[in-house]
């Protein structure tokens, strides 16, 4: 039973990284389209840090940001994907890494960014997993050491991507929103409540986050099971 469960988790993980396993698929092309739209969304300056969030759990934010990290890396950019969801982290599962040392260790000065970052089997893509789940995620993410971490990441990487908790669940995403160059809101087609999505947008803007657009996922299409659309706010 345990082996079967592990196999199911592995299969779900491989499906979630379609840009790696099947880069020529229609869905992978949609991710590349999102990447292009992100890059052209701000004409006067490059976007160095991007946060991806959702209004509620299970809307696909972690799958979205993992695949965006892959397509940015495939473009030749040195990418760091940071798991800032310190409550329900998933990056270490997706990329099959241990999670003994990560964000929380760096923020509490128990490790350096250089020693905590892990290389993946995708060229140019590195991850900083969450590390041990702390009792005070919001305080850590809003600390001065978070600003130091981001500044150091800018020195070492071309693009820094943050996976964060859902906006309506906790304040973590709002805390990070104004530290990032841009934010993407993921919406689950047919599931996300419109009022919830609107409330999430309002909270991000109130936190002085720069909302770049919305990704609509799980939209049924004739050609494929999933469709990702990037639109402005």
Regions found by a protein language model. Name each.
Residues 1-233:
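P-loop NTP-binding module
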């Amino acid at each position: 039973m345990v082996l079967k469960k592990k196999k199911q988790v592995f299969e779900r993980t491989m499906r979630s990284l379609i840009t790696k396993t099947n880069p020529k698929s229609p869905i992978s092309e949609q991710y590349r389209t999102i990447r292009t739209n992100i890059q052209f969304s701000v004409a006067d300056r490059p976007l160095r840090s991007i946060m991806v969030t959702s209004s509620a759990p299970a809307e696909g934010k972690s799958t979205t940001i993992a695949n965006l990290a892959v397509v940015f890396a495939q473009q030749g950019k040195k990418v760091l994907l940071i798991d800032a969801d310190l409550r329900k982290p998933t990056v270490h599962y997706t990329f099959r890494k241990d999670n003994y040392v990560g964000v929380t260790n760096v923020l509490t000065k128990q490790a350096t960014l250089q020693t905590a970052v892990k290389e993946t089997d995708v060229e140019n893509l590195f991850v900083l997993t969450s590390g041990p789940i702390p009792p005070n995620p919001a305080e850590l993410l809003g600390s001065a050491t978070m600003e130091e971490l981001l500044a150091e990441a800018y020195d070492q990487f071309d693009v820094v991507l943050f996976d964060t908790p859902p906006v309506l669940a906790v304040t973590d995403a709002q805390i990070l929103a104004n530290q990032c160059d841009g934010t993407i809101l993921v919406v689950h087609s047919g599931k996300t409540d419109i009022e919830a999505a609107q409330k999430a947008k309002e909270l991000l803007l109130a936190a002085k986050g720069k909302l770049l657009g919305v990704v609509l996922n799980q939209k049924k299409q004739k050609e494929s099971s999933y469709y990702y659309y990037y639109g402005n706010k």
